[in-house]
C-alpha cells in the first residue's frame, strides 16, 4: 500500500504539474479535468475544493504554491472563507479583471461562476504592470505558473499569459468557469412567487446551457463592453482622432533579439524629434509608440490619419470613424508594411527579422482600432429589487473605466476595482443597507480614475480588500446615501422625489466657478468697478467701452500700479484700448479679442466680443477685495508673500502664460501711482518713500536678511514678468503715441514722480530738494533735480501710466538706496547732477540721431518685405521722427542744469529709447513694472546710463537708462521709435499690425473668425485649426510655438531652427550687418560727442540684448508660457551670441532662446528688491567690464568726460569722489536701472547669435559672435544676461568705443575707479562658463551657465581684495570682465577666452591665451598678495590680473579644504564673516563673484572702507564687504570640495578604521554625495541662497539680496582656489580639479565649516535623483587620483605642503607622474555623519545609497592611504577592485532599473497629459462650433428659431464661461507638460554626464572636457528653467488658496456653509 500511495502522490504531482504548465485555455481546462478525476475531487464543491486539492498534492513545488495562496487567504477580511458563504455571483467575462474578481470572491467563500464566450486566450498584447500589481500577482504564485514573470527589470506581461495565471488560480480556488458560453441578458424574477421563489437568472447562448437555471445575488460585468448590463450611463471622453495599430512579431528568443532594448514609450510631448525623424525617413507620422518583448515582439502605436492615407493604409477618407476603419477601407498589405516600417525604425533596425505572429484566425496579428473616444461609467454599481429579490449589479475592468492604453492603467485600475467590488459584496452579504452600500462604492469609484502608482499606498504587503489599506486619505463617505437613490432601482422608490440637489455638497471651487452669471450681472459688476472714474460711464456692454477708458478703469481698479489712469487721454481711444489689451494679456493672460484700432474705428464695439472679453475680467476679479494701496505697499516692502501681494489675482488670468507671466508684481511700485495715492490717501510724497523703502532694492535697513527669501522669489517672478513684458511691448507704436499725447498735454501729471520731496515742491532741476527734510534725507540734491526732470518727463509720458508709476517707485527705491548714508552727501551731489545734465544734453543730441537710425532699422522689421530705404521712409511717414517725444522730453527734462533724468521711463528722454526696439518698450511697462522691484520703469537703456550720477534714485538711473536706451536703439535698430515707453509699445504693435486684417479675419486662411473660435498670438487672430507650424503643419498651442517676425511665420519648437538657417534669413542678416557696420561707423564719429553716453549706451544696448528678449521678439503673454528649449536657451550661447549688431532678424516668438535666457537675465536684474541696486549695477558693470578691460580713473566732476568713458562711469565717478556711499547708491541705482532696461537685441541679432552658436556647438557658448565689433556690442551673453544693466563702473563697453579702444571702466569703488584699458572686444558673453582659457584647464563653467547673467560672473571672479586687478596694459578686453573669469577660469579674474573665443572675438588687445601664461603668473602672485594683503592691494591695482598657478599653488589647490587660508582670516576677520555669510548662502559655485569692480564703481567704498561698511549690519553692506572677500572658488574647486566631502570617508580611512568607516559612510556618504552632486537645482531657484545668511548678497557688491546675481556669482572663496583653476591643464593635478569641476553638478558648495544640513537642504531643493550621486560615487572610484586628492574637509594643508600631501595621496594609486616615496598622510578623523537622508533623497532609496557608499568606501579603502596599501598596495588594490567591480555591476544594474522606472513614470504622465490635452481640445472645438452657431443667430445671420435674444445671449454667456474654464485647464496641462519635458531632459543630461565622467581623466582630451562642460552647463540651464516653472506653479497654488479662503470667508459671513467633496 505504501508504494501505491507513493505512486499516487507522484502521479498526482505530475498531473498537477501538467496543469500548472498548461499554455492554452483549452489545455488548462483539460489538465484540470484530468486532475480532478485523478484526485477524485468535485469541482462544484466550491467550499471544500481548495482544501482537498491541497491535501492531495504535496510535492515541494505544490507546497510552495499552497503557501502563497494560504498567505493571501489568511487576511482577516475573508474570515477563512466564511464571509460570503451564502452569496452566489455571476461574472460575465473571463478577462484579467473578471478572473481577479472571481478569485477574491472565492476567497470570501462565495459561489462564483464565470462565463467566457471564447475558449482560447489569444491576445498577445502586452500590459504594463504597476508595482502593486506585480506584488499582487506574485502573491498568487504567478512565478510558479510563468517562470519569466517580471524577471529582472521587466514590468509587463502579455494578456494571454496573465489570463492563464489567473485562470489556473481561480480553478484551484473552486471557481466554476464555463467557456463558449455567451451572456445575453439578466432575467427578472417571475411575478408568480407563490409556488416557488425564483430569483434573478440570466439568459445565455446556447440557450439550453445548464447555467440557465443558475440563480444569483450578484452579477458583475467584466467583458469590456459598454452595454452588457443595463442601467449604467456612460461619460464620453473624446480626444482627437486616435487610430491605434498593434502588431505582434515572432520572438525567436535569439541573442540578437535579446539585445534589442524595449521602448517603454515615446511621448510626443518631450521627444518630438524622434517622431519628426521617423516621418522624414519613412513618411510614417505617429503620436507615440511602445515596444515590449514577451512571447512576441509587441508594438503598439498611435498613427495620424493623414499619414495612413498617404501610405495607402486607409483607402478613402471618411468623417465617420467606423466607416474609416472598416475592413473594406483598409489595405491589409499596406497596413502590414506600415507596422513593420515603424517597428524597424523604432528599434533602430536591430531586430534580425520581423515576421508577424499569427492570431487565432490564422492571420498576421496586426490590428487597427479607434480609441478616439474613451468611456467611463457614471456609476460603479446599482441595486435592482423585484419581487422581494435584490440583485447587486457591478462593473469592473474596461466596462467600468476604459483605460488609455499607453498609460498601463487598465490592469492596475481593473484590479483595484475588483478589490473594491469584492469589498462591496462582502458588505452586501453582511446586510448593509443598499443605499449606504452604494454610497460607499461610489465614494471609492471617484478615487479610481485618479489613482496612479504614486498616489496609492506604497506598503503593498498590507493590501487587502479593505480600501483603507490601498487608498491614502480615504473618505468613504464623500457620497451620501441620498445621492445614490437613483441607483436603487425598485418599483416602490420610483415615485419618491429625490432630495433637493442643493443639499448635495459641492466643492468650493465648483460653487464659485459655476455660480449663475448673466450678462446683466456682468454689466452691473462693470458699473460698480468703474464707478467714480472720470469720463467713464458704463451703460451697456458696447458703446460705453469704445474709448478704452472703461477697460483701463477696471484694470486700474484692481491693479492700480499697472495703469496710470490720470494720464489717459479720452480722445485717444486707440491707445487706451490697446494699452488695456496689452496689460490684460501681459499681466493676466487674457488674450485680446480685437485690436485697439478696431475698437476705436467701430461705432459700436461688437457685443459678443465684449461679453466674452469682459467675462474673463469678471471671473478673474470677482470677489476680490480691493487692496488698499498703502497696505499693499507695506506688504510688498515687507516682502510679504508675493502671491498674496498680488492680491489673489494671478498675473496670468488663465494660467495661459507661462512662468514669465506669472511673476508676481514685484516691483516696488505701489498699487497706485503717487498722484492717486495722494488723492486717495492724503499722504504726502514725503511719506511715500517710507512705503517704498521697504521694497526698494537698495534699502539695506528695511530689506533685512529676513526678507531675502521673499525677494529672491520676487526676483524670479519679476524676471519672468520682465521677459514677458519686454517681449510683448517690443512693438507698441501706441505707446509712442501715448507718450506723444502726454507730452503734448504738458501738465505735470505727477510732479513728485521722481522723488517725494520733489513732488511737493517740484523744484527746478538745479534746486536742492525742497524742505521736506525726512524724505530729503533719503534723497540727494541731484535726486531732487532729477526728480524735477522726471516730473517733466513724466508729464510728457504721462500717457504711459505704467511707465510713470514705475518711475516713481524706482525713484523712491533709489532714494532709499541712498538711505541715510547718502543724506550727508546731498550737497555734493548737486554739482554732479548738474554735470550730468551736461552729459545728458550731449546724450540727447546723440540719441536723436540714433533714434532716427533706429527708426529705419525698425522699419526693416515691420516691413521686411521692403528694402531698407523703403522701410525707413515708411516708418518716417508713419511715426514722423519730429514727433518723437524725445525732443520734448529732452528739452523738458534734460536741461543742462538738470540731469533731467530721462529716467522717466515713460517717454524715455529719447523717443528713440522709447521707440527703441520695443526692447525698451517691451521692457518698459511690463518689464519695468516687474522690475519695479527696484522701482525702475525706464527704458532699460535709459536707466542704465543715467543712474550712476544722477541720483542714487530715479534720476541717476533715469539718466543711465536714457543713455542706454539710445545706444540700444541705435545698436538694435529694432522697432520704430515707440514713443511711449509704456507697456503700450506692444499694444502699438498690435494696434497697427502692418500686415494684418481685422480681428475677425484669420491670419492664415483669411476667412472669418468668429468670436468664440478666435485665438490670438503675436497680434494675429486665427482659427485653432489654422495655427500650425509653417514647416511640418503640426497644430501649435498658444503656450508652445515660435514666431519669425520677419516672415510672419509660426513654427513648432523643433523647426524653429529653420527660420535661422534659411537663405532668406542669411541675406537679410547680411543686409542688416552691413547696415550695422555703417551705423557703427556713424556711432564712432559720434562717440566723442557722446563721450560717456556713447559708451554707456553701448553697454545698455548690450544689456538689452542680453536681456534676451530680442526687441523684435514679440512676446505674447502666452509665449512666456513656453519655456525656451534648453538648446535655445543656452545662456552661454546667448552670451556668446554676437553683439547686438550681429543679432539678426530672426526672433523667437515664444522666446525660445530669449525666453529662457531672458528670463534668467531678467531675473538677475530684478533679483533683489531688498538688495541695493548694486545688484543690478553689477549686471551692467559686467557687461561693460567684460567687453573690455578698463582702468578706473577717478573722475572729477569738473573734468570733462573722456571720450571713451561710459556715461555710467562718468556719472559714477562724478559721484564717487566725494562720497563713496553716495556713489554706491548711485551706482546701484544705475545698475538697477540698467538691468531693468536692457534693450533687447534685435531679432536679427538673435538670429545671428543662434546661427553662430549652431556653427560651433561645443564652443558656441564660449565663443563670441564672429567678429562683430559693433560699438554697442551687447554682451554676447545670453539675453538673460542682457537684462543686467551695465554697472556704471563697468558700464564702459569696450565695444562702445568705435575706435576699438575700450572706454575706461570704473571699478565699483571710487578709489578703485580704474578703467581698464583694453581694446573693445566684442563683449564676450559674461558667461564664459564654458569658455576656457586656451592655456587654462577646462573647468566646469560656474553655475552661471544656468543663469543668463554671466556678466556678473565676470565681476564675481574678481574680488578686488583677493584677485588683484590686472594692470590695464595686461588686461585684454576679456580681462576687463572679471566676472567672466569665474566662468571660464573659475579661479582667475581674467576671462580666458575659449580658444574659439579668442579666434572669433576681435581683440584689440592681445589674446587671453597668450596672456594666460604671463598674466596668470603675475596674477596668481598678485592674487595671493591680495588675498593676504586684502583690499589694499586691490586699490593699488588698476587692472585685473590673470592668475597663473605655480606648481606650489597647484598643490595648494589640491588642498580641498573649504576653509579660508589663515592669511585671509588674519587679513580680514570681516572678510571671513562675509565669506561665511556667503557660504551660508550655499556658496553657489555658479555665483560669479559680483564684479568687484562694478560694485566699486557704484561708489562702493574701497576695500579700506570695507571694514566700516561691514560693521553696519545690513545685508547690503555685507554684500559690499563680500566683494572684498577672497575670490570665489572656481566651480571646479567647489565641486572637488563637495566630492571630497562625500568621498573622503572612503579615501581617508586607514585600514583599521575601515569597518567603522563603512558604517559611517553608509550613513554619511549618501547625504554628502547628494549634496555634492546636486545642489544645482536649488541654487538656481534663487531660493537656497536666500535661506542662508545675509551673506548671500555677497555676490553682488551692493545688494546682498540680489538673488539672481547670487545664483550666478561664485561664492567668494580664498583666492587660493583660483590658482588651480587658472593653471593650464598641464599637470595631472590641475586636471583633477578640472575634472572635479566637470563632475560636480552642485551649484552651491557649502563651506566645509557649514553643517551638512545646509548642504543637504540645498540638495533637496534641487530634487535631483539619487541615482546621480550614486553613479557619481561609482565613477569616482575610477578616478583614484582624484579620490586621493580629496583631503578631509577639516584638514588643512599649508600651501607649501600641499604638493607633498598630494603626492602622498596619489602614491597608492601608482600615478607614476605624481607618485612619490613619501608615506601616505594619516587618515583624518571621520566627519560626523550627516542626517540619514539628504533633503532631496527619498528615504526609501537610502539603502541603495548606503550600499553605494559602502561599496565605494571599500573600493576606495584599497586605494586610500592605509597600512595595507603601504605594504602591498598592488595586492589589496586587485582584490578590492574585483569586489568593487562586482558591486559596481550590481549597482549599475539597480541604477538602470531605477532610471527606467523614473522614465516610465514620466512617460505615463506625458501620455496622460497628451490625452487630456486632446480631450480639452475636442471640448473646446465643440464649444466653438456651438458658439459660432449662437453668434450667427445673435447677429441675424442664421435662423434663431423660437429663441429670443435674451435666451441666446444667456446661452452664449454660459458657453463663454465654459470655454474660459477649458482654457484655464489647458494652460495648466501645458505647464505640467513643460515641467515634465524639462524633467526628462534633465534626467538624460544627468545620465550623459555620468557616462562622460566614467571615463578616466587621463584618457580625456580637450574635446571630452569641452563636451563635459557643455553637458554640465545645459544641465544647469534645465534646472534653472524647472525652478522657474515650479515657482510659478507654487505661486499659482498659493494664489488660488488665498482666493478659496477669501471666498469661504465671504460665504461664511452670509451664514452659509460649504463642504468640500
UniProtKB/Swiss-Prot annotation:
Enzyme Commission numbers on file: 1.14.13.225
Residue ranges, compositional bias (Pro residues): 899-910, 1718-1733
Ranges of residues in domain LIM zinc-binding: 1000-1062
Membrane-spanning segments: none
Residues noted as binding FAD in the record, renumbered to the chain: 97, 116-118, 123-125, 183, 298, 398
Domain of life: Eukaryota
Species name: Homo sapiens
Pfam families in UniProt: bMERB_dom (PF12130), CH (PF00307), FAD_binding_3 (PF01494), LIM (PF00412), Rossman_Mical (PF25413)
Residue ranges of domain Calponin-homology (CH) in the record: 516-619
Region (Monooxygenase domain): 2-494
Ranges where the record places region Interaction with MAPK1: 1324-1363
Annotated catalysed reactions: L-methionyl-[F-actin] + NADPH + O2 + H(+) = L-methionyl-(R)-S-oxide-[F-actin] + NADP(+) + H2O
Summary of the function given for this chain in its UniProt record: Methionine monooxygenase that promotes depolymerization of F-actin by mediating oxidation of residues 'Met-44' and 'Met-47' on actin to form methionine-sulfoxide, resulting in actin filament disassembly and preventing repolymerization. Regulates the disassembly of branched actin networks also by oxidizing ARP3B-containing ARP2/3 complexes leading to ARP3B dissociation from the network.
One BP term from GO: heart development
GO molecular function: actin binding; F-actin monooxygenase activity; FAD binding; metal ion binding; mitogen-activated protein kinase binding; monooxygenase activity; NAD(P)H oxidase H2O2-forming activity; oxidoreductase activity
Motif Nuclear localization signal: where in chain: 660-681
Main subcellular location: nucleus
Protein's recorded name: [F-actin]-monooxygenase MICAL2
Gene: MICAL2
Quaternary structure annotation from Swiss-Prot or TrEMBL: Interacts with PLXNA4. Interacts with RAB1B. Interacts with MAPK1/ERK2. Interacts with RAB35, RAB8A, RAB10, RAB13 and RAB15 (in their GTP-bound forms); binding to RAB35 is of low affinity compared to other Rab proteins; at least in case of RAB8A may bind 2 molecules of RAB8A simultaneously through a high and a low affinity binding site, respectively. May interact with MAPK1/ERK2. Interacts with CORO1C; this interaction recruits MICAL2 to the actin filaments.
Range of residues in the leader sequence: none
Domains (record comment): The C-terminal RAB-binding domain (RBD) (1796-1945), also described as bivalent Mical/EHBP Rab binding (bMERB) domain, mediates binding to predominantly RAB8A, RAB10, RAB13 and RAB15 (in their GTP-bound forms).
Binding sites annotated in the UniProt record for Zn(2+) 2: 1029, 1032, 1052, 1055
Cofactor(s) for this UniProt protein: FAD
InterPro entries per UniProt: bMERB_dom (IPR022735), CH_dom (IPR001715), CH_dom_sf (IPR036872), F-actin_Monoox_Mical (IPR050540), FAD-bd (IPR002938), FAD/NAD-bd_sf (IPR036188), ProQ/FinO (IPR016103), Znf_LIM (IPR001781)
Amino acid at each position: 500500500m505504501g508504494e501505491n500511495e507513493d505512486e499516487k502522490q507522484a502521479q498526482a504531482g505530475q498531473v498537477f504539474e501538467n496543469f500548472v504548465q498548461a499554455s492554452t485555455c483549452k489545455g488548462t481546462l483539460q489538465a484540470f479535468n484530468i486532475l480532478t478525476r485523478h484526485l477524485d475531487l468535485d469541482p462544484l464543491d466550491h467550499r471544500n475544493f481548495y482544501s482537498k486539492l491541497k491535501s492531495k498534492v504535496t510535492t515541494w513545488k505544490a507546497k510552495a504554491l499552497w503557501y502563497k495562496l494560504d498567505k493571501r487567504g489568511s487576511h482577516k477580511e475573508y474570515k477563512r472563507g466564511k464571509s460570503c458563504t451564502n452569496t452566489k455571483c455571476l461574472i460575465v467575462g473571463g478577462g484579467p479583471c473578471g478572473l481577479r474578481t472571481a478569485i477574491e470572491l472565492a476567497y470570501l467563500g462565495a459561489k462564483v461562476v464565470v462565463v467566457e464566450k471564447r475558449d482560447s486566450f489569444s491576445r498577445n498584447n502586452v500590459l504594463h504592470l504597476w508595482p502593486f500589481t506585480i506584488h499582487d500577482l506574485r502573491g498568487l504564485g504567478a512565478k510558479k505558473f510563468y517562470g519569466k514573470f517580471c524577471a529582472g527589470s521587466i514590468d509587463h506581461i502579455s494578456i494571454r499569459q496573465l489570463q492563464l495565471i489567473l485562470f489556473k488560480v481561480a480553478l484551484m480556488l473552486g471557481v466554476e468557469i464555463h467557456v463558449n458560453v455567451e451572456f445575453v441578458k439578466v432575467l427578472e424574477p417571475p411575478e408568480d412567487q407563490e409556488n416557488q421563489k425564483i430569483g434573478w437568472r440570466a439568459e445565455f447562448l446556447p440557450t439550453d446551457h445548464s447555467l440557465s437555471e443558475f440563480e444569483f445575488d450578484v452579477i458583475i460585468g467584466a467583458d469590456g463592453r459598454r452595454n452588457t448590463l443595463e442601467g449604467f450611463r456612460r461619460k464620453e471622453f473624446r480626444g482627437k482622432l486616435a487610430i491605434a495599430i498593434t502588431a505582434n512579431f515572432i520572438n525567436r528568443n535569439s541573442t540578437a533579439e535579446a539585445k534589442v532594448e524595449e521602448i517603454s514609450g515615446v511621448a510626443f510631448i518631450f521627444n518630438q524629434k524622434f517622431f519628426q525623424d521617423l516621418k522624414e525617413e519613412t513618411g510614417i507620422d505617429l503620436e507615440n509608440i511602445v515596444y515590449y518583448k514577451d512571447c512576441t515582439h509587441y508594438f503598439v502605436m498611435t498613427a495620424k490619419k493623414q499619414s495612413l492615407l498617404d501610405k495607402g493604409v486607409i483607402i478613402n477618407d471618411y468623417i465617420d470613424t467606423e466607416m474609416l476603419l472598416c475592413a473594406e477601407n483598409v489595405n491589409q498589405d499596406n497596413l502590414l508594411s506600415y507596422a513593420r516600417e515603424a517597428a524597424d525604425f523604432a528599434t533602430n533596425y536591430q531586430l534580425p527579422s520581423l515576421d508577424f505572429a499569427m492570431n487565432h484566425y490564422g492571420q498576421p496579428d496586426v490590428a487597427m482600432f479607434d480609441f478616439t473616444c474613451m468611456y467611463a461609467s457614471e456609476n460603479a454599481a446599482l441595486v435592482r429589487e423585484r419581487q422581494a429579490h435584490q440583485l447587486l449589479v457591478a462593473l469592473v475592468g474596461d466596462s467600468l473605466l476604459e483605460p488609455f492604453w499607453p498609460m498601463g492603467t487598465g490592469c492596475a485600475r481593473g484590479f483595484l476595482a475588483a478589490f473594491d467590488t469584492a469589498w462591496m459584496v462582502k458588505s452586501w452579504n453582511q446586510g448593509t443597507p443598499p443605499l449606504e452600500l452604494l454610497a460607499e462604492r461610489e465614494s471609492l469609484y471617484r478615487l479610481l480614475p485618479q489613482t496612479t502608482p504614486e498616489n496609492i499606498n506604497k506598503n503593498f504587503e498590507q493590501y487587502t480588500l479593505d480600501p483603507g489599506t490601498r487608498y491614502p486619505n480615504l473618505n468613504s463617505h464623500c457620497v451620501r446615501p441620498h445621492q445614490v437613490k437613483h441607483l436603487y432601482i425598485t418599483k416602490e422608490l420610483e415615485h419618491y422625489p429625490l432630495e433637493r440637489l442643493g443639499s448635495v455638497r459641492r466643492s468650493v471651487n465648483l460653487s464659485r466657478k459655476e455660480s449663475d452669471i448673466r450678462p446683466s450681472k456682468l454689466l452691473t459688476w462693470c458699473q460698480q468697478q468703474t464707478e467714480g472714474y472720470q469720463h467713464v460711464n458704463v451703460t451697456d456692454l458696447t458703446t460705453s467701452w469704445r474709448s478704452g477708458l472703461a477697460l483701463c478703469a477696471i484694470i486700474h481698479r484692481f491693479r492700480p500700479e499697472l495703469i496710470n489712469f490720470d494720464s489717459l487721454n479720452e480722445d485717444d481711444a486707440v491707445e487706451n484700448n490697446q494699452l488695456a489689451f496689452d496689460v490684460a494679456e501681459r499681466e493676466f493672460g487674457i488674450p485680446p479679442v480685437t485690436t485697439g484700432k478696431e475698437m476705436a474705428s467701430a461705432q459700436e464695439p461688437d457685443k459678443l466680443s465684449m461679453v466674452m472679453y469682459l467675462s474673463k475680467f469678471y471671473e478673474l476679479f470677482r470677489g476680490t477685495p480691493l487692496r488698499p494701496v498703502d497696505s499693499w505697499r507695506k506688504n510688498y516692502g515687507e516682502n510679504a508673500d508675493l502671491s498674496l501681494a498680488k492680491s489673489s489675482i494671478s498675473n496670468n488670468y488663465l494660467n495661459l502664460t507661462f512662468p514669465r507671466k506669472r511673476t508676481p508684481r514685484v516691483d516696488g511700485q505701489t498699487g497706485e501711482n503717487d498722484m492717486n495715492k495722494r488723492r486717495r490717501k492724503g499722504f504726502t510724497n514725503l511719506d511715500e518713500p517710507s512705503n517704498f523703502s521697504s521694497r526698494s532694492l537698495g534699502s539695506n535697513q528695511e530689506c533685512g536678511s529676513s526678507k531675502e527669501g521673499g525677494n529672491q522669489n520676487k526676483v524670479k517672478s519679476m524676471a519672468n514678468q520682465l521677459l514677458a513684458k519686454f517681449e510683448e511691448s517690443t512693438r507698441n507704436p501706441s505707446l509712442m503715441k501715448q507718450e506723444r499725447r502726454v507730452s503734448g498735454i504738458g501738465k505735470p501729471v505727477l510732479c513728485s514722480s521722481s522723488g517725494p520731496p520733489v513732488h511737493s515742491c517740484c523744484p527746478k532741476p538745479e534746486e536742492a530738494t525742497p524742505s521736506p527734510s525726512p524724505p530729503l534725507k533719503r534723497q540727494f540734491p541731484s535726486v531732487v533735480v532729477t526728480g524735477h526732470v522726471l516730473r517733466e518727463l513724466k508729464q510728457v509720458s504721462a500717457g504711459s501710466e505704467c511707465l510713470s508709476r514705475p518711475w516713481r517707485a524706482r525713484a523712491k527705491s533709489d532714494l532709499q538706496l541712498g538711505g541715510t548714508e547718502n543724506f550727508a552727501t546731498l550737497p555734493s551731489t548737486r554739482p554732479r547732477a548738474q554735470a550730468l545734465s551736461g552729459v545728458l544734453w550731449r546724450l540727447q543730441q546723440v540719441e536723436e540721431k540714433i533714434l532716427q537710425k533706429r527708426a529705419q532699422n525698425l522699419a526693416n522689421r515691420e516691413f521686411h518685405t521692403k528694402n531698407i530705404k523703403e522701410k525707413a521712409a515708411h516708418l518716417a511717414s508713419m511715426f514722423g521722427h519730429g514727433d518723437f517725444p524725445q525732443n520734448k522730453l529732452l528739452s523738458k527734462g534734460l536741461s543742462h542744469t538738470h540731469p533731467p533724468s530721462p529716467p522717466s521711463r515713460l517717454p524715455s528722454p529719447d523717443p528713440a529709447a522709447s521707440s527703441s526696439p520695443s526692447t525698451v518698450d517691451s521692457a518698459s511697462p511690463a518689464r519695468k513694472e516687474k522690475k519695479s522691484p527696484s522701482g525702475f520703469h525706464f527704458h532699460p537703456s535709459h536707466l542704465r546710463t543715467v543712474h550712476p550720477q544722477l541720483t542714487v534714485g530715479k534720476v541717476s538711473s533715469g539718466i543711465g537708462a536714457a543713455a542706454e536706451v539710445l545706444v540700444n536703439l541705435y545698436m538694435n535698430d529694432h522697432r520704430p521709435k515707440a514713443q511711449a515707453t509704456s507697456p503700450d509699445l506692444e499694444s502699438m504693435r498690435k494696434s497697427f499690425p502692418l500686415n494684418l486684417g481685422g480681428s475677425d479675419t484669420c491670419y492664415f486662411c483669411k476667412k472669418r473668425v468668429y468670436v468664440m473660435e478666435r485665438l490670438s498670438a503675436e497680434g494675429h487672430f486665427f482659427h485653432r485649426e489654422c495655427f500650425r507650424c509653417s514647416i511640418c503643419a503640426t497644430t501649435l498651442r498658444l503656450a508652445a510655438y515660435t514666431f519669425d517676425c520677419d516672415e510672419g511665420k509660426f513654427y513648432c519648437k523643433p523647426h524653429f531652427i529653420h527660420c535661422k538657417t534659411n537663405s532668406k534669413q542669411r541675406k537679410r542678416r547680411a543686409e542688416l550687418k552691413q547696415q550695422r557696420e555703417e551705423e557703427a561707423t556713424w556711432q564712432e564719429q559720434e562717440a566723442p560727442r557722446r563721450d560717456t553716453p556713447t559708451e554707456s549706451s553701448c553697454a545698455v544696448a548690450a544689456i538689452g540684448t542680453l536681456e534676451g528678449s530680442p526687441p523684435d521678439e514679440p512676446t505674447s503673454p502666452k509665449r512666456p508660457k513656453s519655456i525656451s528649449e534648453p538648446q535655445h536657451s543656452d545662456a552661454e550661447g546667448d552670451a556668446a551670441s554676437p553683439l547686438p549688431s550681429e543679432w539678426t532678424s530672426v526672433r523667437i516668438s515664444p522666446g525660445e532662446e530669449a525666453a529662457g535666457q531672458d528670463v534668467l537675465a531678467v531675473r538677475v536684474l530684478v533679483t533683489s528688491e531688498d538688495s541695493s541696486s548694486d545688484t543690478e549695477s553689477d549686471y551692467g558693470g559686467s557687461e561693460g567690464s567684460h567687453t573690455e578691460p578698463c582702468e578706473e580713473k577717478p573722475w572729477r566732476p569738473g573734468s570733462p568726460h573722456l571720450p571713451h568713458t561710459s556715461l555710467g562711469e562718468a556719472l559714477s565717478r562724478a559721484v564717487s569722489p566725494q562720497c563713496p556711499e553716495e556713489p554706491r547708491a548711485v551706482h546701484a541705482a544705475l545698475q538697477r536701472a540698467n538691468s531693468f532696461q536692457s534693450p533687447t537685441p534685435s531679432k536679427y541679432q538673435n538670429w545671428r547669435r543662434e546661427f553662430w552658436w549652431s556653427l560651433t556647438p561645443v564652443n558656441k557658448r564660449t565663443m563670441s559672435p564672429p567678429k562683430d565689433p559693433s560699438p554697442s556690442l551687447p554682451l554676447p551673453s545670453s539675453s538673460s544676461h542682457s537684462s543686467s544693466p551695465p554697472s556704471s563702473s563697468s558700464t564702459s563697453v569696450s565695444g562702445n568705443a568705435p575706435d576699438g579702444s575700450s572706454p575706461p571702466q570704473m571699478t565699483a569703488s571710487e578709489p578703485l575707479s580704474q578703467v581698464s584699458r583694453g581694446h573693445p572686444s566684442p563683449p564676450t558673453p559674461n558667461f564664459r562658463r564654458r569658455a576656457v582659457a586656451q592655456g587654462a584647464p577646462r573647468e566646469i563653467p560656474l553655475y552661471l551657465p544656468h543663469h543668463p547673467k554671466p556678466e556678473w560672473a565676470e565681476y564675481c571672479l574678481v574680488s578686488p581684495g583677493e584677485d588683484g586687478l590686472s594692470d590695464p596694459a595686461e588686461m585684454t578686453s576679456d580681462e576687463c570682465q572679471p566676472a567672466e573669469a569665474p566662468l571660464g577660469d573659475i579661479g582667475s579674474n581674467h576671462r580666458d577666452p575659449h580658444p574659439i573665443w579668442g579666434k572669433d572675438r576681435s581683440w584689440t588687445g592681445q589674446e587671453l591665451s597668450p596672456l594666460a601664461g604671463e598674466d596668470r603668473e603675475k596674477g596668481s602672485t598678485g592674487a595671493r598678495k591680495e588675498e593676504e594683503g586684502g583690499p589694499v592691494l586691490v586699490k593699488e591695482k588698476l587692472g585685473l590680473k590673470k592668475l597663473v598657478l605655480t606648481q606650489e599653488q597647484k598643490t595648494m589647490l589640491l588642498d580641498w579644504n573649504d576653509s579660508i587660508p589663515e592669511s585671509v582670516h588674519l587679513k580680514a576677520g570681516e572678510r571671513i564673516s562675509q565669506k561665511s555669510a556667503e557660504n551660508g548662502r550655499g556658496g553657489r559655485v555658479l555665483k560669479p563673484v559680483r564684479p568687484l569692480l562694478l560694485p566699486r564703481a557704484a561708489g562702493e567704498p574701497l576695500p579700506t572702507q570695507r571694514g566700516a561698511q561691514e560693521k553696519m549690519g545690513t545685508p547690503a553692506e555685507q554684500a559690499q564687504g563680500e566683494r572684498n572677500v577672497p575670490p570665489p572658488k572656481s566651480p571646479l574647486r567647489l565641486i572637488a570640495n563637495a566630492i571630497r566631502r562625500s568621498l573622503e570617508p572612503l579615501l581617508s580611512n586607514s585600514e583599521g578604521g575601515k569597518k567603522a568607516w563603512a558604517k559611517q559612510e553608509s550613513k554619511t556618504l549618501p547625504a554628502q554625495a547628494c549634496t555634492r552632486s546636486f545642489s544645482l537645482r536649488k541654487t538656481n531657484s534663487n531660493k537656497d541662497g536666500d535661506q542662508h545668511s545675509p551673506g548671500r548678497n555677497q555676490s553682488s557688491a551692493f545688494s546682498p539680496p540680489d538673488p539672481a546675481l547670487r545664483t550666478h556669482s561664485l561664492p567668494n572663496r580664498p583666492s587660493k582656489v583660483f590658482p588651480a583653476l587658472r593653471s593650464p591643464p598641464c599637470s595631472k593635478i590641475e586636471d583633477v580639479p578640472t575634472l572635479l569641476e566637470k563632475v560636480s553638478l552642485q551649484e552651491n558648495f557649502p563651506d566645509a565649516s557649514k553643517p551638512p544640513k545646509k548642504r543637504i537642504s540645498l540638495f533637496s531643493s534641487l530634487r535631483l535623483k539619487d541615482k546621480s550621486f550614486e553613479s557619481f560615487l561609482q565613477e569616482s572610484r575610477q578616478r583614484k587620483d582624484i579620490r586621493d586628492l580629496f583631503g578631509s574637509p577639516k584638514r588643512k594643508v599649508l600651501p607649501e605642503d600641499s604638493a607633498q600631501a598630494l603626492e602622498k595621496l596619489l602614491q597608492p594609486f601608482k600615478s607614476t607622474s605624481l607618485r612619490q616615496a613619501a608615506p601616505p598622510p594619516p587618515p583624518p578623523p571621520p566627519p560626523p555623519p550627516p542626517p540619514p537622508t539628504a533633503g532631496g533623497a527619498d528615504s526609501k532609496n537610502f539603502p541603495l545609497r548606503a550600499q553605494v557608499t559602502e561599496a565605494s568606501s571599500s573600493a576606495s579603502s584599497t586605494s586610500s592611504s592605509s597600512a595595507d596599501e603601504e605594504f602591498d598596495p598592488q595586492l589589496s588594490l586587485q582584490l578590492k577592485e574585483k569586489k568593487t567591480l562586482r558591486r559596481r555591476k550590481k549597482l549599475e544594474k539597480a541604477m538602470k532599473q531605477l532610471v527606467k522606472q523614473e522614465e516610465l513614470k514620466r512617460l505615463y504622465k506625458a501620455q496622460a497629459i497628451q490625452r487630456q490635452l486632446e480631450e480639452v481640445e475636442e471640448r473646446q472645438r465643440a464649444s466653438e462650433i456651438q458658439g459660432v452657431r449662437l453668434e450667427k443667430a445673435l447677429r441675424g445671420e442664421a435662423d434663431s428659431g423660437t429663441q429670443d435674444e435674451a435666451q441666446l445671449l444667456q446661452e452664449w454667456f454660459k458657453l463663454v464661461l465654459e470655454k474660459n474654464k477649458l482654457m484655464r485647464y489647458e494652460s495648466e496641462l501645458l505647464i505640467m507638460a513643460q515641467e515634465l519635458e524639462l524633467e526628462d531632459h534633465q534626467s538624460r543630461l544627468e545620465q550623459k554626464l555620468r557616462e562622460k565622467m566614467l571615463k578616466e581623466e587621463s584618457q580625456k582630451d580637450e574635446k571630452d572636457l569641452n563636451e563635459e562642460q557643455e553637458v554640465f552647463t545645459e544641465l544647469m540651464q534645465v534646472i534653472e528653467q524647472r525652478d522657474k516653472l515650479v515657482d510659478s506653479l507654487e505661486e499659482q497654488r498659493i494664489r488660488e488658496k488665498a482666493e478659496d479662503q477669501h471666498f469661504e470667508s465671504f460665504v461664511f459671513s452670509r451664514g452659509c456653509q460649504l463642504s468640500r467633496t
